[in-house]
Structures are given as structure tokens and as C-alpha cells.
Amino acid sequence: MSNFSHAVKYNVISSQLARHYYQLKNRSLKQIVFVATTGRSGTMSLVDIFNHIPHCKAEHEPYPAMFDEVLKAKCAGNEAFVANMYWRIKSVNLWRAAAGYHHYFESNHLFIKTYIEYAVEDFKDKVTVIHLVRDPVKVANSIYALQDFPGTEEGNKWWLDYTAQNNLIKIANYLDNDPEFKHPFYKGLWYWYEIEERVKDWRKKLPHVRFLDFNTEDFNNQDKTFQLLRDLNIDFDESALTEYVNTRANTRPHQKLSPPLPLEQANKMHQNFKTLLSSLPI
């Protein structure tokens, strides 16, 4: 799409008209599901499962993903830019994608970082959030293997900027200068804990929104996975979904530039990090 066509399609008036049109086409929509997670946590497994259930639709990081310049604006406190991107572009695309379905799921770890408050205002009581949690050492090691941890050019597009003033866990001085904690693995650990703090914070700010807790490791457990779907009030045929449980998706082995740290070393560093956090007034 040319810049001119994009500007016409997503100007304020066009966006308002398009949103109203797609809202009318979403009369059958019962629920829109988002995920509050770090990424590297199994969200693609959920996408695969959702897309094999009648009247359900799932997409992974659909346009606009709200990353890069949107995430950087959020980290810099430029809320006007983020709000404009949501209401002018993101909202329309969400309503369009959900049209014709009973349940729509967006798998996007940028949700908790850039646009949760706008999505809740937009979809109101239709919103459910899955708080998807993977072991912090596994998440940090996965990010470390990709070598795109916070602080790198690519990492700041997708994860978070550990130097941002609006972080809940402000330890940039340690991550930059401490002989122990300036190892890049710690930036992945910081990211995991920062996301968890943000989830806690949003749960307090949005007490009317339903959050469902789920562990990534439980995707290997058919009973727990099916219970999650029941908790989402989704009708499904267990026999039709059995083959999609226990599968791994989006492991990105071709993008991993470094071997992960040995588990013993990673666990020791995690313990060091927890000791640091416990000593700080966070």
C-alpha cells in the first residue's frame, strides 16, 4: 500500500466509519481474547488450537503489531502517539479480524506493553486476558540465544527498553555497570520480571477485566489445556483438538545465534538476580 493510500484509508474520519461498520458486523462476537505474556512462551500453540475450533479465529501478531516505533513511544511516555496508532489503525483491524466469529484471539506480547488500556476501552466486557507464564530462566535463555535482548536494536523493537523511566523495575545502573549484572542474560531476566510486575499492575487497575492464569508447561497437559478453553466458555470437540495439544510452534531455531547458557549457570544467575531484586525498594 502506498503512503498516500495508507493515509487515506487510516485518516481519522475513515477510521471512525470503518470501526462503526465492523462493529455492526460483530454482533455475534462474544469474546476477544488477548494474552499478557513475555513472548517466547508458547502463544503460537494457542493460535493453532483456536484455529481448529468452529466459530473461533486466532492470529499471531497481526498488523499493526504495535512494536518498534509504537513500543519506543510507549517507553518514552509519548502516549498521544500510541493512542493515535490504536484508535486510527489497530482498533479497525481488530474489529475487522473478529467479524463473523464468536471468539477472536490475538496472540501478541505487545498487548501488555503498548495497548491493553485502549483495547479494554474499545471492547469493554468482551475482553478476556490469558496471563501466560513460562519459567523465567527459559524465557531469558531463549532471548539470550536469539541475541536480541533488551538494549539491542532488535530487542528494543520487540521486548522493552530497560533504561525507560516508566519501567516498574528500574535497575539500568546495575545492568549497565555492575561486573556481575551487566551480562546480557540478566537483561532477559529483568524483562521477565518487569512483565510480571506490569501484569500485576494492570490487574489492579482493571479489576473488572477477567484474567486467566496459565503456565506454558501446561500445554503438554491435555486436561489443563482443555480446561483453559472451558474457562474461556468456548464450545469445542475434544477429539478434534487432541492432535494440536503438546505441539511446539515458533521455536525459531534458525534465528538463534548463540547456544543458551548451561542450565546450572543460568539457575545460579537467576538466584543472583532474585537476591538483587529483594535488596531493592521495588
Feature names for model-found ranges:
Residues M1-A99, A240, Y244-K256:
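PAPS-dependent sulfotransferase catalytic core
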Residues D48-F123, E154-W159, T163-E180, N272:
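PAPS-dependent sulfation machinery
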Residues F123-A145:
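Conserved phosphate-donor/acceptor-positioning beta-strand/loop module used by diverse small-molecule
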